[in-house]
């Protein structure tokens, strides 16, 4: 096997000759340089993973830690120079602040003495005798570890080694496993210092960790909804399409209503004091505005395209007939979903470890502080690029596999005898020859996605700094341009993958050939394909709507302690990727079928010498659709001619 890249098509005289569209048996590796680049990129990701394992400590974020470097709820290793470190805290799972009503921040560090305790004091303790009694009865020692409970009332150092009196009643909260004071005045001071002055990245990571079970449950909900949508499209009827569109409309309106209701609830809540709550309120307003705009656009499109429902049902029935030639195509997304879940879990674990990476430094008094390591922010950015590029690569592999299977089944003369194992055959061709092409296509998508994220971040930053309307307008225009480019590249990539599956050419050659042949035959199927893609997109919107609604209801209960807007965005992103990985089966099959149809028209004429590969049902469907489009075009021209020939009347004043 010679991996030399793409072939150039030239005649014997050296002049370019016309592309011969035929599925290739003998292939060459394509875009190998891009595959090598992806390998180098993943070498960097593996280095970051190893570094996060060595330097990170996600447990400190998840379980909390005391002032001496001990992680609560765990058995710890000693820190050199800290005599009270290295203790077994297996039974002491809660973080207790000895001066919870008067926390202070000096520089970037929280000036506090914290201990790991087995229980939080649920009643106020007014004297050292009560602190001693609480320790003897509950086994929860609220003074520094070096002081025995017997000496709480006898040692002259007890005042400095025990909590400031009175000790307010407190209750353990799942986030950080901290003992949170319950008296109103202490709670307000405690929360404003502890939560508002924590680094934003750590607050986000803590929100993700505290809601990890909810996030996982919502991903499972997105999986169930995606499966339901996939089987709806598999056995689609006109009635199901009407029910489906009604559900989409109700879902959009319902989510918009809930978001505006939550914003109204926040604005009328006089108890909001934390920055996290204010951030949540701003994010809810942003979500509400964006969802309202999307809802309005989609409702207009649904109203305009409502008359094409019958053609859509026929289109999906033809698609299902193609899928029946390779029925295991419907199970391909399960493998994609499993790989995506594994990668996302690994990515989040590394992110948490990076967020907690720090070097232990012993301060005076034997206390331990963790200083952030240099370069962590750059690693976090590199890690984020890895999330986008690798996720797109996994989804692109699925698109290439499905396109290859459709190509194999389409270019088969014996329709009653489909080829054996088309999916495995397509997967093997992808793995051995065309991984570089998929890497290049996914890289182009990532190059557009990353600036979109940066523009969105800068737009939010400008909004907070109250910059002028012109700058915000320019950023919105940039975001819209990147969005349009992203959608165009997605469509171009899909057709390029199908062309690579047919001809075995590299990405750029395939994209150019696909663009030429689709432009030449666009009159046959552009409107049908666009409406089919629109219906599939509505299916993805339905999955995201109901998943986000579940997230709103779940996260809103803990809104006082979480920056839940970011976990909700993460849930929406994962829900869309899950829905896309499942429903894109139909989208990929549709695009591949129409490209194969265009190739069939280009290379055959339906005669006995050059018969079409397509079946009669597909051909008659395209003809009916073209007649409908031509009739509407003629009707529009006729109405325009009538308007042009209308006699001008005098203006009566």
Curated annotation (Swiss-Prot):
Q: Which family does it belong to?
A: Belongs to the CTL (choline transporter-like) family.
- Tell me what topology the record assigns in the membrane: Multi-pass membrane protein
A Pfam family hit = Choline_transpo
User: Which stretches does the entry tag as region Disordered?
Assistant: 632-653
Biased composition (Basic and acidic residues) is annotated at 634-644
Matching entries from InterPro entries are given as: Choline_transptr-like
Q: Which residues are glycosylated?
A: 136, 151, 412, 503, 521
Specify the species: Homo sapiens (Human)
Q: Where are the transmembrane segments?
A: 34-54, 213-233, 243-263, 284-304, 334-354, 384-404, 534-554, 563-583
UniProt name for this protein: Choline transporter-like protein 3
């Amino acid at each position: 096997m010679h991996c030399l890249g793409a072939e150039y098509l030239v005649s014997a005289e050296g002049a370019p000759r016309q592309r011969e569209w035929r599925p290739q048996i003998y292939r060459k590796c394509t875009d190998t340089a891009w595959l090598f680049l992806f390998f180098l990129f993943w070498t960097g990701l593996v280095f970051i993973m190893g570094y996060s394992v060595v330097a990170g400590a996600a447990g400190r974020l998840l379980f909390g830690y005391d002032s001496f470097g001990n992680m609560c709820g765990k058995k710890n290793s000693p820190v050199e120079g800290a005599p009270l470190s290295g203790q077994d805290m297996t039974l002491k799972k809660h973080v207790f602040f000895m001066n919870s009503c008067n926390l202070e921040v000096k520089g970037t560090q929280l000036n506090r003495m914290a201990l790991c305790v087995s229980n939080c004091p649920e009643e106020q303790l007014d004297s050292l005798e009560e602190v001693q009694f609480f320790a003897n009865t509950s086994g929860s020692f609220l003074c520094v570890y070096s002081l025995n409970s017997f000496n709480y009332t006898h040692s002259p150092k007890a005042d400095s080694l025990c909590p400031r009196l009175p000790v307010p009643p407190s209750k353990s909260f799942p986030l950080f496993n901290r003992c949170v004071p319950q008296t109103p005045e202490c709670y307000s001071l405690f929360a404003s210092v502890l939560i508002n002055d924590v680094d934003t990245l750590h607050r986000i990571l803590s929100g993700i960790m505290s809601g990890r079970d909810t996030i996982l449950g919502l991903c499972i909900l997105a999986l169930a909804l995606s499966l339901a949508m996939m089987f709806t499209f598999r056995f689609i009827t006109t009635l199901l399409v009407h029910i489906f569109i009604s559900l989409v409309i109700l879902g959009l309106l319902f989510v918009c209503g809930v978001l505006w209701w939550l914003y109204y609830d926040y604005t009328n809540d006089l108890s909001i004091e934390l920055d996290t709550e204010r951030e949540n309120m701003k994010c809810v307003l942003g979500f509400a505005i964006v969802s309202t705009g999307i809802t309005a656009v989609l409702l207009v499109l649904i109203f305009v395209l409502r008359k094409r429902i019958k053609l859509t049902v026929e289109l999906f029935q033809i698609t299902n007939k193609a899928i029946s030639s390779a029925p295991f195509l419907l199970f391909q997304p399960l493998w994609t979903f499993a790989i995506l879940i594994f990668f996302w879990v690994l990515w989040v674990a590394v992110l948490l470890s990076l967020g907690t990476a720090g070097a232990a430094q012993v301060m005076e008094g034997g206390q331990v502080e963790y200083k952030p390591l240099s370069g962590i922010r750059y690693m976090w950015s590199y890690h984020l690029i890895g999330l986008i590029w690798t996720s797109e690569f996994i989804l692109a592999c699925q698109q290439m596999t499905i396109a290859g299977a459709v190509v194999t089944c389409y270019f088969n003369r014996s329709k009653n005898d489909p080829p054996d194992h088309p999916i495995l055959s397509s997967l093997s061709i992808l793995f051995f020859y065309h991984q570089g092409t998929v890497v290049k296509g996914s890289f182009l998508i990532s190059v557009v996605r990353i600036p979109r994220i940066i523009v969105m971040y800068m737009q939010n930053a400008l909004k907070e700094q109250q910059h002028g309307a012109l700058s915000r307008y320019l950023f919105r225009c940039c975001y819209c341009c990147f969005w349009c480019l992203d959608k165009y590249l997605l469509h171009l990539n899909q057709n390029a993958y199908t062309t690579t599956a047919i001809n075995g050419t590299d990405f750029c050659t395939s994209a150019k050939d696909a663009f030429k042949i689709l432009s030449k035959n666009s009159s046959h199927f552009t409107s049908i394909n666009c409406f089919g893609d629109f219906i599939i997109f509505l299916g993805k919107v339905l999955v995201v709507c109901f998943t986000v609604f579940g997230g709103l209801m779940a996260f809103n209960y803990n809104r006082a302690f979480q920056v839940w807007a970011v976990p909700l965005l993460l849930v929406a992103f994962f829900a869309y990727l899950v829905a896309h990985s499942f429903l894109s089966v139909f989208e990929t099959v549709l695009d591949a079928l129409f490209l194969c149809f265009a190739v069939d028209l280009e290379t055959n004429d339906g005669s006995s010498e050059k018969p079409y590969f397509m079946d009669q049902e597909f051909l008659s469907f395209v003809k009916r659709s073209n007649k409908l489009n031509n009739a509407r075009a003629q009707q529009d021209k006729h109405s325009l001619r009538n308007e042009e020939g209308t006699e001008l009347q005098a203006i009566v004043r």
